[in-house]
């Protein structure tokens, strides 16, 4: 069996003619790592203070849950985190292999990703700064409908069945100027997806079991902040009440998103998707949905989608969202802090929200069932504190709501059903 290796990369004093096997013989560019087929237990160390300009790190078909973890991290005692400035390089072609749950969503096209994990498992990436900027001349070019999608970190599951143990820790991802409109391309700060396999009968469904994203600072990204798990198998989750076995066969499991700070996301902040019992806790979403307005969201064509909330699950079963803090989400057709969206058994507890322009909480449409909102605190959320949007049921109990004069407790024209128990609604005095 081949022995694992530690590779060193330094933009400051490396040389691509070196062997990369020691600090004194470090590689200079990330391209040298892209050329290597990493094996279980390999480590890639990037020197603090290094800046990898117009570079990217793309790993494919590596890692094994039955072997040691691959790790990519910083080394050195002093200096800033190693920084990858991709600037629209690292282009790959994304294709779900099918249309998505709404026919207007774009499902294929070019994407620029600073870090791409394509059919990679059992990997830890930490202690890196990432940007993927576009130097646009004016708002018309920024808002262009065909602008290329960009990602800080993208992950794809396709031809290896279930991918296990992908961990992202202490990443500073900012200034990722992706497409304003594309919701389900790998487009934003961190975005993970599953594509149609070449031979699903042989490999099994493409899915994730074991994703942990923690301690990351995601700032000024478009469109999504952190999204885990949009899937080509979306049709298997069309029912109102969702069966656990469907998730174990086609969906995602053991998804943990915690201790992250998302600021100025163009659209939504944090969303697990098609996941069984995902845990989303101790996150902060600050001033998100900044591009969901007529000034920027100008040319959606058939994509529609000028909607975003902050922290919410999509088509999940028994999602738990707790100890999160959301403020200043910008007004759009949604614009609230939290949203139980077309899922079964979503639970929000011990969360805080304040000054969100679309309100505190939404129960979204007829497929949002068996959801609860308990022991949360809302302070001066606007437009309407609660948004029951045609949902058949919701249990809202033991919450405290501080409501500004003139702001309705239930958003206007909302007629979903809620059971209210032991809540405190306190008027904010002028």
Predicted regions and their residues:
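Right-handed parallel beta-helix
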Residues: 69, 121-132, 161-177, 201-224, ...
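Right-handed parallel beta-helix/beta-solenoid
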Residues: 1-31, 48-50, 76, 80
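Soluble non-cytosolic domains of exported or imported proteins
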Residues: 24-27, 119, 162
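Extracellular beta-strand/beta-solenoid scaffold signature
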Residues: 56-60, 91-115, 139-159, 181-204, ...
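Extracellular beta-strand repeat scaffolds in secreted/surface proteins
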Residues: 42-46, 74
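Right-handed parallel beta-helix/beta-spiral solenoid domain characteristic of secreted/periplasmic
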Residues: 63-146, 175-183
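Loop/turn elements at helix/coil->beta-strand transitions in domains of secreted/extracellular proteins
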Residues: 3-5, 39-43, 68
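Short, T/G/N/S-enriched strand-turn elements that build extracellular solenoid repeat scaffolds
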Residues: 31-37, 52-63, 83-85, 274, ...
């Amino acid at each position: 069996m081949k022995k694992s290796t530690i590779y060193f990369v330094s933009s400051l004093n490396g040389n691509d003619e070196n062997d990369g096997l020691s600090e004194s013989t470090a590689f200079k560019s990330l391209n040298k790592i892209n050329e290597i087929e990493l094996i279980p237990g390999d480590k890639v160390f990037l020197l603090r203070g290094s800046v990898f300009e117009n570079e990217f790190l793309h790993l494919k078909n590596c890692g094994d849950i039955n072997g040691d973890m691959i790790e990519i991290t910083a080394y050195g005692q002093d200096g800033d985190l190693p920084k990858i400035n991709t600037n629209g390089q690292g282009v790959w072609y994304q294709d779900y292999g099918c249309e998505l749950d709404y026919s207007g969503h774009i499902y294929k096209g070019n994407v620029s990703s600073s870090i791409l994990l394509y059919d990679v498992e059992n990997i830890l990436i930490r202690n890196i700064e990432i940007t993927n900027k576009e130097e646009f001349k004016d708002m018309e070019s920024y808002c262009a409908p065909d602008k290329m999608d960009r990602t800080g970190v993208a992950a794809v599951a396709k031809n290896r069945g279930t991918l296990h143990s992908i961990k992202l820790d202490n990443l500073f991802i900012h200034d990722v100027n992706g497409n304003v409109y594309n919701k389900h391309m790998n487009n934003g700060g961190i975005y993970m997806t599953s594509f149609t396999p070449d031979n699903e009968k042989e490999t099994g469904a493409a899915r994730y079991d074991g994703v942990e994203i923690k301690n990351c600072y995601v700032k000024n990204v478009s469109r999504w902040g952190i999204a885990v798990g949009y899937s080509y198998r979306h049709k298997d989750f069309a029912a109102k009440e969702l069966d656990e076995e469907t998730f174990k066969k086609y969906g995602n499991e053991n998804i943990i998103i915690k201790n992250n700070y998302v600021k100025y996301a163009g659209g939504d902040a944090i969303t697990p998707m098609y996941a069984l019992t995902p845990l989303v806790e101790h996150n902060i979403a600050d001033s998100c949905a900044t591009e969901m307005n007529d000034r920027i969201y100008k040319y959606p064509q058939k994509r529609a989608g000028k909607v975003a909330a902050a922290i919410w699950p999509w088509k999940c079963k028994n999602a738990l969202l707790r100890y999160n803090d959301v403020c200043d989400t910008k007004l759009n057709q949604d614009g609230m802090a939290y949203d139980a969206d077309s899922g079964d058994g979503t639970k929000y507890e011990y969360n805080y929200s304040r000054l969100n322009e679309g309100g505190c909480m939404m129960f979204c449409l007829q497929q949002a069932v068996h959801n609860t909102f308990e022991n949360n605190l809302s302070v001066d959320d606007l437009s309407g504190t609660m948004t029951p949007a045609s949902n058949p049921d919701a249990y809202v109990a033991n919450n405290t709501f501080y409501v500004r004069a003139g702001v309705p407790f239930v958003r206007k024209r909302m007629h979903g059903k809620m059971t209210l128990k032991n809540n405190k609604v306190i008027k904010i005095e002028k």
